[in-house]
Swiss-Prot record:
Keywords: Cell inner membrane, Cell membrane, Crown gall tumor, Membrane, Plasmid, Transmembrane, Transmembrane helix
Domain of life: Bacteria
Organism: Agrobacterium tumefaciens (strain 15955)
Phylogenetic lineage: Bacteria, Pseudomonadati, Pseudomonadota, Alphaproteobacteria, Hyphomicrobiales
Cellular location(s): Cell inner membrane
Protein name: Protein virB8
Key word Cell membrane present: yes
Length: 230
C-alpha cells in the first residue's frame, strides 16, 4: 500500500501504536498462562499431599481364622488379640513347623526348608544352623545323604517350659536307599521372641511373628522299624 509523503509521519505513529498494543497483549497473555500453570501445579501438589495423608502406606497383615464351637468362623488381625487357645495354637504350629523343617531332610525341598529356618532364626542361631547345613561340613545331611536318602519327622508333643520356651518331642525316621529305616525320638528345646516388625514377605511363612533365639535338640531313644518305639 502506497502512503503519501505528507501522511508518512501519521502512518508510522499508527504502526508503532499497533505494535506496542500487540506487545502489551502478548505480555498480558503470558502472565495469565503463567498464573494458570502455577495454580495447576499448586493444586496437584495439594491433591497429592491430601491423598498421601488419607491413604496409609500399604503393608501385608496376616488374618487369623478359627472355627467357633457353634460352627461360625471368626477372625482377627493381631495375634495378641486372639483368644488364648487360638494364640497358643498359632505359636505351637509355627514352632513345630520350624522344628520339622530344621530336623527333616529331602533333597527336593532342602532349599525351601533352609530359607525358612534361616529367616525364622535370630543371627546367632541362623549362623549355627547354616554352618551345620552348608558344605563342606561332613555332618551335613547334604553330605551324608544327598539324594540317596531322606529324614522324616513326626510330631509327638509340645510343652511350654516358660512363657517363651517350648520343648517339642518328635519321632525321626532316617531312610537310606538299600538300608532298613532307623527310628529315633528326640526333644528340641526352643526359646523364642514375638516381634511385630517382620517384613511382609516373611509374614507369609511366619504369621505368628516368632524369632527363635536359642535352639537345642537331644536324642531320647533309637530303635529299628518293626520294634516298638517308646
Amino acid at each position: 500500500m502506497l502512503v503519501a509523503r505528507e501522511s508518512l509521519a501519521e502512518h508510522y505513529k499508527e504502526v508503532e501504536a499497533f505494535q506496542t498494543a500487540r506487545a502489551k497483549s502478548a505480555r498480558r497473555l503470558s502472565k495469565i498462562i503463567a498464573a494458570v500453570a502455577a495454580i495447576a501445579i499448586l493444586g496437584n501438589v495439594a491433591q497429592a499431599f491430601a491423598i498421601a495423608t488419607m491413604v496409609p502406606l500399604s503393608r501385608l497383615v496376616p488374618v487369623y481364622l478359627w472355627i467357633r464351637p457353634d460352627g461360625t468362623v471368626d477372625s482377627e488381625v493381631s495375634i495378641s488379640r486372639l483368644p488364648a487357645t487360638q494364640e497358643e495354637a498359632v505359636v505351637n504350629a509355627s514352632l513345630w513347623e520350624y522344628v520339622r523343617l530344621r530336623e527333616s531332610y529331602d533333597a527336593d525341598t532342602a532349599q525351601y526348608a533352609y530359607d525358612l529356618v534361616s529367616n525364622f532364626s535370630a543371627p546367632t542361631v541362623r549362623q549355627d544352623y547354616q554352618q551345620f547345613f552348608n558344605y563342606p561340613n561332613p555332618s551335613s545331611p547334604q553330605v551324608i545323604l544327598g539324594k540317596r536318602g531322606r529324614v522324616e519327622v513326626e510330631h509327638i508333643a509340645s510343652n511350654d517350659v516358660t512363657p517363651s520356651t517350648q520343648q517339642i518331642r518328635y519321632k525321626r525316621t532316617l531312610v537310606v536307599d538299600g538300608k532298613m529305616p532307623v527310628v529315633s525320638t528326640w526333644t528340641a528345646t526352643v526359646r523364642y521372641e514375638k516381634v511385630t516388625s517382620l517384613p511382609g514377605r516373611l509374614r507369609l511363612t511366619n504369621p505368628a511373628g516368632l524369632v527363635v533365639t536359642s535352639y537345642q535338640t537331644s536324642e531320647d531313644t533309637v530303635s529299628n522299624v518293626g520294634q516298638g518305639a517308646p
